[in-house]
Amino acid sequence: MVKHIVCWNLFENAKGKTKQQNALEIKEKLLDLKNKIPQIQTIEVGINSDKANPDNYDVVLITEFNNFEDLEVYQKHPAHQDFVEFVTPLRSDKIAVDFEK
């Protein structure tokens, strides 16, 4: 099993929306990837709580794949590429980690 974890920091305002509005749209689009990319075994998306440290990242994605080959299929999938194109102008920073469980 391979875990793929990505965190994004978002601009305060981007594309005419607030950070919170964009975070909610990002979450919706990410969760929808499970319906489009069968290689995703599990998917979870979190938005940093307003009660949490404001220095935390704004949005986190946690996905699981059977192997690195499935992760590669996911990353090249047109639905994932569409998401990358959508999120890029909204984010100020991104980090990611991929590891085997």
List PLM regions with ranges:
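Short alpha-helix boundary/capping motifs
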Residues: 89, 99-100
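C-terminal structural segments of small proteins and small subunits
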Residues: 68-89, 93
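Short S/T/G/P-rich N-terminal loop/turn motif that feeds into the first structured element of a domain
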Residues: 1-57, 66-72, 100-101
